[in-house]
């Protein structure tokens, strides 16, 4: 089973979208094996967005992601990374397919509600950045015995 990192950003938390997003994730068949509401500090934000250091939008990005709580999750399932990315939609909500999280809820590219890992390497890095190994649980969903 593949794992991926997904985070409801401050705009999604502040707008009360955690429950809706979790519902969509579970209905899609992905399993949440870790989750926590947390406040990202500048140090963690800089590690998370290290590839953007030096870019013109970096300070705004750090300011936004540290502006309020986020809901961080580790998801597990077949093709979890691609599945989560399809559910999220394109970064720019105006280009996101109807029915995706960003098309339905995001307001602007800079306030696009959700983040998800884009590769197995970034998923592993982000999971290790936000979760200790003992925070990630293994369990069987009730439906698994029927499939």
Swiss-Prot record:
PROSITE patterns recorded for this chain? Answer: NDPK, NDPK_LIKE
| Record keywords, A-Z | ATP-binding, Cytoplasm, Kinase, Magnesium, Metal-binding, Nucleotide metabolism, Nucleotide-binding, Phosphoprotein, Transferase
Q: What is its EC number?
A: 2.7.4.6
State the GO CC annotations: cytoplasm
**Active site (catalytic residues):** 115 (pros-phosphohistidine intermediate)
Spell out the coiled coil positions from the record: none
Catalysis performed (reactions): a 2'-deoxyribonucleoside 5'-diphosphate + ATP = a 2'-deoxyribonucleoside 5'-triphosphate + ADP; a ribonucleoside 5'-diphosphate + ATP = a ribonucleoside 5'-triphosphate + ADP
CDD domains for this protein: NDPk_I
Which cysteine pairs are covalently linked by disulfides here? none
InterPro entries xrefs: NDK-like_dom, NDK-like_dom_sf, Nucleoside_diP_kinase, Nucleoside_diP_kinase_AS
Q: Which residues bind ATP?
A: 9, 57, 85, 91, 102, 112
Q: Which cofactor does it need?
A: Mg(2+)
Q: Which GO terms describe its biological process?
A: CTP biosynthetic process; GTP biosynthetic process; UTP biosynthetic process
Molecular function GO labels: ATP binding; metal ion binding; nucleoside diphosphate kinase activity
The cross-references to Pfam families, in alphabetical order and at most eight, read: NDK
Localization of this protein:
Cytoplasm
Question: Where the protein is mainly located, per its record?
Answer: cytoplasm
Annotated family:
Belongs to the NDK family.
User: Its function?
Assistant: Major role in the synthesis of nucleoside triphosphates other than ATP. The ATP gamma phosphate is transferred to the NDP beta phosphate via a ping-pong mechanism, using a phosphorylated active-site intermediate.
Q: Indicate the quaternary assembly.
A: Homotetramer.
In Swiss-Prot or TrEMBL terms, this protein is called Nucleoside diphosphate kinase
Q: Which organism is it from?
A: Listeria monocytogenes serovar 1/2a (strain ATCC BAA-679 / EGD-e)
Lineage of the species this protein comes from: Bacteria, Bacillati, Bacillota, Bacilli, Bacillales
């Amino acid at each position: 089973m593949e794992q991926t990192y997904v985070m409801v950003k401050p705009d999604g938390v502040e707008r009360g979208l955690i429950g809706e997003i979790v519902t969509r994730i579970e209905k899609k068949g992905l399993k949440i094996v870790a989750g926590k509401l947390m406040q990202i500090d500048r140090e963690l934000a800089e590690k998370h967005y290290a590839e953007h250091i030096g870019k013109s939008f970096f300070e705004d990005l750090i300011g936004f992601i540290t502006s309020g709580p986020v809901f961080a999750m580790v998801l597990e399932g077949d093709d979890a990374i691609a599945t989560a990315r399809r559910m999220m939609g394109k970064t720019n909500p105006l280009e996101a397919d109807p029915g995706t999280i960003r098309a339905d809820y995001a307001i602007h590219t800079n306030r696009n509600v959700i983040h998800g890992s884009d590769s197995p390497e970034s998923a592993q890095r982000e999971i290790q950045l936000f979760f200790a190994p003992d925070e990630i649980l293994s369990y069987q969903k009730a439906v698994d015995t029927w499939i």
